[in-house]
Amino acid sequence: MEIVRNGIKCCLAWPPNYVLIFGEFYHFKCRRSVITYDWSNLVGADEFLCAVGYAHPNYREPDPDFDPFVMYCSSNKMLALDTVTDELYIIAESPAHFCSIGLRNFPPFARIELDIELDRLWYGETKCSGEEFVLLQKNIPALKNFVNRQCGQKIRIDAFQNFDLSFCSSNDIHYITGSGILEKILRRKYVVIGTCARCQVEPNCRAVILLGPNFHIYVYCDNKINKVARSIREFIRRGFEELLYKERYALNWHDDSLIYVSESEAENLNRMLNGESPILRKKPRHMYPRCDRYVKIKVLLFGILYTILLLMVPWMFFFRLLKNMPSILFAVHSSEISNPLVQSVTKFLHPIIIPNGDTELKYIVPVTESRLINGLQASAAGRFGIKGLRLCSDGVIWNRLIDYEYEMFKYPSTFTRADKFLLQLRDLKFMEDFDPKWQCITKLAAVGFYSGASLFNLGAKPGIGYWCRYLCEYLSMLFFKLDGKLKELSKESKQKLGGFSCAFWSESFKTEMQNKTESFFRRDFFDRFQLYLLEHFLLFCGCEECRYNFFRFKNVGTMKKNPGSVKLHFFPALGKIDLPIFPHLSEKYSNLSMFVAKDLCLSFIEGQIEHSRFPISVTVDMGQDKRNLLNILSNIVFLLFIIQTLNSVLFTELKMYYDVYLDELKNLESSMECEMKLGSKGCMNNIVYFNMLKQVKDIVRNPGTSSNFIFNCLEVIKMSFEIPYYKNYDETNFMESFYLHHLYIQRQPAKHTDLVAANNLAPGFFIVNAKEKSFIDVLERSIVNIEAEYLSNTKNINGAMALFFSGLKYFGNFGNGNFQTSPEKDVRAVGYKLGGLDKIQNDLCYFANVETLACVGVDASDGNE
């Protein structure tokens, strides 16, 4: 590559007002040579570099000892030289890529200090110039105080990606993937500064960001600590680009401070965060200062001995017990002591005076306005607008909806299905001051949100409709392969079929196979393929098992033979379903019925796809061409069975939700008419209310069908939320019970899995500002009718899904390797807590609960103080 005309300038895509001037080093009177950098570890042994030119601001000439010099590599990559440090960086994958991004991937630009205007011009919403957070990088005590003050606040990370950093400290985190790992990290002198993630991610799924002992920025992810940037400023501007850059080109940081955690050390937090752990006590274990069980045993033995010695002085022993009891203090900053929201919590506490010189570590729970506002996102009332429920019922509904909002799992069987959800809906408990006639609004909202997310959102992986589309595309690919396998049949195989194959695979039948909408969900279409599979086994094999299966199915029409019928664990309301007949199935598929009952084999199918294998393989001694054809037919029958069973579950659930929707819709109409007749304040003369009633009556007369009722349901929900009583309902009592419970002031018992899960997840919503777009607005943009055209992916096509399976047409094998499944991934990796052991600070006001006031060992002030 040779530069034809030196001195030509062209504008760069980034930074703004930068240009690239072409020329060799010597054209700019620089003594460097491109050949020198051919020995860089970024350049392969058989590669070479060519000069391109200097990048510099347009208002001045290039500075050879300051501005970056751009080079081209023979492997088509673009590189840039930092002329200050003499380091070489890969900045683009190709010249075209370089033209589109400019010098975005040039790390030294992210480290320089810019004035406020230029910083905004270069990096948009990210702020670094003069920011306190950036300036405190090497002042660890001040940085910790800053993080504690800003806990719950977010800042934008990465000017070119949608990341955010939420401030929090090690006192706000209970576990990172497992017990003891956080302590191990802190012992290595790392400092927790927050958690980071893309937007619309649950707080418990965020990655922990750390400041290392060398003042570099690290991230804890996938059971290891990785360096992401050399400074806070660079991390704010570039995010994780440096880490991705190192991994992409297999480069090392040469950093001995990296930590790797073994899988045995990393526990699965999902069991705790999903509510499967033992029931929480009145105070969780992390609120006890003495966490060493051996210390507790020694203290207990000492107490027994002390009891014997002080048997004549019982009051001294009682005082000793009180002094050793764990205490919780609630800290409020002096600037927020008069905040109404903070006062709604502190009115249940007693202010206390801390003696001067008290250096003992105490368990302190910060109470701030931002935390209390954030915390309401951990309730169905605050996040979804579903009002009137008691705390226990609110936690159940919130936990169910939050899983769907964040798409926490990938298989529908992991979520609660309609039968169990409607039982929970029936058992909802409402606040005593909530008018019973408006309970229908709460139930309508719960049914509408849950059914919309679980059934009508065909683009989300947790939905049943998504998997119908997924498997329909897979089945279409199998039909394509079937045509190829028929052409591969040998002359001897065709003679064995005796002309049957020609009659079977007629042009009309091929057209029917290609019509996904009309064929894939029909029972007779499945029965035909089941019969064709058995006929082909009879003609190719002809053993006793094949003859028995064929004539039994042909004459009796039953499929209870081999392997039998099963009942779906996740949806028993469907009853027992008969399994297809697969002659000569491999021995490793003996547990196939167990996987069908567990999750309809979805994890098994996806696991096989990930390893480029087809789900079903048969073991029969015959030619390869015949075995391939039988394998394809077996997989077609298997997928048709799964698709039609999913379809049955889908429409059974639709019917269940639709019946509840109709009942609650009629209840809403009656309640609104009653309110209108009684002439309650704000209704009789309210033309808006009258119009809403008219619209509800119209919807009652035309409620829609079970396959499209969600559209009317969401319209009714939005109108119902505007009804004066519901809109203006005073939630003070609920909010008080919510804060008292989650701040461990007045804990309510949690014996239900959903309540335990809600209790474990809620601290993360207090600490991380998780307020997102309105759930109902997001739902309205993603729902579609439940029709065969949508379920078969022939209407509103998921292009990525179709492209994926079209690429698999020429790949795949049968029966090689072990039986593979794709289990649910453990996406929740951070467990939060609302306080930690800390020292008393002078600028904070402290409060104590009435129950533990005597345990603090300090004086209680009167109300005036």
Swiss-Prot record:
Disulfide bridges in this chain: none
Superkingdom as given in the UniProt entry: Viruses
InterPro entries found in the cross-reference section: UL27-like_protein_herpesevirus, US22-like
Family label: Belongs to the herpesviridae U4 family.
Protein name listed in UniProt: Protein U5
Organism in which the protein naturally occurs: Human herpesvirus 7 (strain JI)
